[in-house]
Each structure stands twice: as C-alpha cells, then as structure tokens.
Amino acid sequence: NYNAQGQMEENTNKSYIFDVVNNSWTQIAPPNNGEGYWGKLGAPPFVALPDGRVMLSYFGDFGRSSYNESMIYDPVSNMWTLTGTNKQGRTTEAGYTLLSNDKVLTVNTDRGVSSAEIFDPATGRWSPAGNTPQVLANSEIGPALTLPSGKVLAEGATGANALYDPATNSWSAAPNFPKLGNGLQLEAPDNYSVILPSGNVLTSTGTFICSTQNCTIMGPSPFFEYDWKANAWIRVIDDLLIPSSSAKGADYVMLSLPTGQVMIAYKDKIEFYSSSGIPDRTWLPIVDSISSENISPATTYQISGKQLSGLTQGTHFGDEHENATNYPIVQIENIKTHHVSYARSFDFSSTSIQPNVSSTFNFIVNPKIENGPSLLREVEEQRLCPRY
C-alpha cells in the first residue's frame, strides 16, 4: 500500500509503503526526489493503475498555470518516473478515475472550464475527453466513479453532475443535486461516493460557500443514492448516529466492505449502511481454477479467473483521500459453524476493471482458521462468486 503525506498546511512530500504482513511503514524517496515542484505534495490526485503502479500528480496552486507534471511509482523497482507532461488542464483539487479500458479520466478543475482529459498509461500521454454539459469544478470537485455499465458518474462541486461514456468519448447530463429549503444548492465538494451491490452509488453531499477570500465546505450533508437505471437521485433517510444536519460531507470516510455494506466513519463515530438490491449476474467474478481444493493454513494457493477485481474502483473521493477496492478477496465459511474468515490475497497479476479480463492472484489462509469442510468464495466489489 502506498501513502503520500502532504496537505498544504504541512508542506511535506513524505511518502511511505505499508507492509501488511509486518504491519509497518517504510519511508521511500519522494516523487522526483523532492526536486522542482515536488518539495511538497499538497492534496494530490492519484490512482492505482491495473499493473500495480501508482500515478500521482502535482497539486499546484490556482494562481500558477505550469503545474502539469505527474509521476508514476513502481513498487517493484521502488522508483519514480516522470509522465503525462502534455496535460492541458491543472491538476489542482482534481480526481483520477480508472476506466474499464485501463485508462484514467480526469475532469479539469480550472475555474469556469468544463474540459476533461484521458491519460493512457501505455503511452504516458494525455488526450482530450470532451466537455461536461455543465461546469463541475468550483475550486473543488466531487468524486467520479466508473459504474458496472462502464460509464462514469462524475459529481460536481457546483451541484451539477455528468455521465461519461468511454465507448463514444462523450458526456451527457446527470440530474443535479436538489436544493435545500433555504435555497442553497447541495453539491459534492471533496465528498465520498461508494458503489453498492445493486450498481447504485451512495454519496454524501454538502454546501460550498465561497467569498472573495476563500471557500468553505459546510453542512448539512444529506446522503443520496444514485439510481443508475432511472438516472435519478434518491434521498437516503437521515441517521440519528451521524445526523446530516450537523455533519460536513468532506469529513466522512466511506469504505465498501465484502459483506455488501458500506462502513461510514465520522469523527469518533462509525456506522454501517445496508442497501437493497442485488448485482447483475454478469458482474460476478468467474473462478476458472484454484491450485488446490484442500486448503491448509499458512500455505499459499493461486486462483485464476475473469473479472476477479470487479468492474469499478468501488470508492472515490475526488482527490487526496482514495481507498479503491478493485482487488480480489477470499472469503471462507465453515459449513458447520458458519463462521466466516478472510484469507490474505496478494500478487495480483492485474487489478483491471475491464469486463471478462483474465487474471490470477495468490492467497494464504490464517493459521487460526477453524478446521473442517468450508465454502470458499472470491469477493470483488461486494459481489460474491458462486461457491467453490
């Protein structure tokens, strides 16, 4: 796992790798060894590429127009490489979305601009991706998630939203967020969105109040589900534990879980959101083979199949707080006790979200697992494969 530290007020460019086996962090060299613009990272856009590398762009300032550099970190070589220097729009407060063709989409955050661009990891170059029907950025921008259909739902910090179709490289309008009773427009500035098992999207909202000096994200922050079939927003009932009337959407942290639920953390509170609906069978992972059907603790096994990493990144924030979950997980249920445990999965050949793409990964079972006949399932993006 890669982590880059450096909010604007911290003025750092520290970067770390997390070792899940030893539960420890190791500091690595910063992008470009900290030279040039990379003396601090700010709140940079970044994305995990399907081959395991991480792409990170310079945060910059709205007052400067020359910040178009990106770096790619290769965990195998432990090295950074300059890329994407032909980008036209600023990367300030932008977000990067992995597409179903393994490319990366971003909506530019220059004020008053509606343009978008696509990065091709194979060439290291950006190309135009059309214009959104309405401006989505307002010094901040909302999350943009690839849906199981392959289209991208891009949410705006202006109240406007849009859908991108990679097949046609074109945009269409999605419904705006509603207004509050006092007339303030609900928006998604620095807000999380999560794909639900049904393919709908859970998102938090807020208001974005700007003066001549600065902009402030404020509550209330009601939750909505985007119904991808109806192309409509549905208000989610308020919760007493984390009341939307006193919360700021930018302070939520949301994570999709292999149970199909969404974990929502806000300050010192944690709760779980359960939705209705089931996934389409064509979204399910397909397990072609497993290296052994007799599973023993502390032994490595390999699974091969298709769509093992799902058809979406799972979660998106907009810029600096990404926690994508497009990687496979192994769930083991003891038939007698129905106790569930999870193996540690690793060495993913690919985390591509292309439909029907083939891949492999390894897993190792916890030494403390219960003995006895068990059901093994592969989980991706809250969707279980048939029992194996």
Task: Name each model feature, range by range.
Residues 247-284:
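Blade-level signature of beta-propeller repeat domains, shared across WD40, Kelch, NHL, RCC1
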Residues 1, 30, 39-42, 126-131, ...:
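Immunoglobulin-like IPT/TIG beta-sandwich domains and homologous Ig-like subdomains
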Residues 13-21, 68-75, 115-121, 161-166, ...:
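Beta-propeller blade signature
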Residues 4-9, 60-65, 110-113, 159, ...:
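Short glycine/acidic-enriched loop and turn motifs that connect beta-strands
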Residues 12, 43, 65-67, 91-93, ...:
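A detector of repeated loop/turn-to-beta-strand junctions in beta-rich toroidal repeat architectures
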Residues 19-35, 72-86, 123-134, 168-183, ...:
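Trp- and S/T/G-rich repeat-edge/linker motifs of beta-rich repeat architectures
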Residues 1, 5-9, 51-57, 101-107, ...:
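Entry beta-strands of beta-propeller and related beta-repeat scaffolds
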Residues 42-46, 93-96, 141-144, 189-193, ...:
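Beta-propeller and closely related beta-sheet repeat lectin domains
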